[in-house]
Amino acid sequence: MCSSDLGDYDGLSVVPRPGHADYTAGVKYGGHADFAGGGAFSGRLTAPLCIAGGICLQLLKKQGIEVISRIASIGSVEDVTPLTVSTADKPFPVVDDAVGETMRAEIAAAKAEGDSVGGIVECAVLGLPVGLGGPLFDGMEGRISSIVFGIPAVKGIEFGIGFWAARLRGSENNDPFVVENGTVRTTTNHCGGILGGITNGMPLTFRAAFKPTPSIRSEEHTSELQSHA
């Protein structure tokens, strides 16, 4: 995943690109920041994360744990079909293929205008035992979030119904417990499979928001930092 011309990145320490880490990295690391291809802040670093994830998926499968995911939205286009099966074999990983075509059109429209769009990825972990995690800083939400935010362009995360829970009453948000065939489960999963930072045996679900790709063809404003122009 090489850059075709590293010269494209010359001068970014004094003329930072909007939406990129050029300015913040330049201030923090001074003359030691690597701007070629975005350096440590490049979206290319998604590639090794995918490799590591692929290995982890195989190890988890041996434990009876499955991780499934899908594109939940692109721009304003949302796939509201529940995530229940893997979309890994699809070239465009959505549950509803018709909605996927609309998402593709949304991407193409932004590209034609020299712009970009963001999106949301939804994940579910199936087969987790009860009792993983802990309170406070050992909670599953915190541990997962620290990893997810290591993915380039991630700007937000929510577990279960996330921020929507703030609009509900406790009686609406609470997940009732039932016992089926000797197994404790809940009739709903608003909590996303986590209570008190600890897994409860239900699918662990979360959604991660990705900002629009900052590298766009549209003209943008910035400043020449040395002359403050």
Annotate each language-model stretch with its function.
Residues 17-27, 218, 223:
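Pore- and pathway-forming membrane helices of multi-pass small-molecule/ion transporters and channels
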Residues 21-24, 48-57, 104, 142-149, ...:
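Predominant activation on well-ordered alpha-helical scaffold segments within soluble catalytic domains
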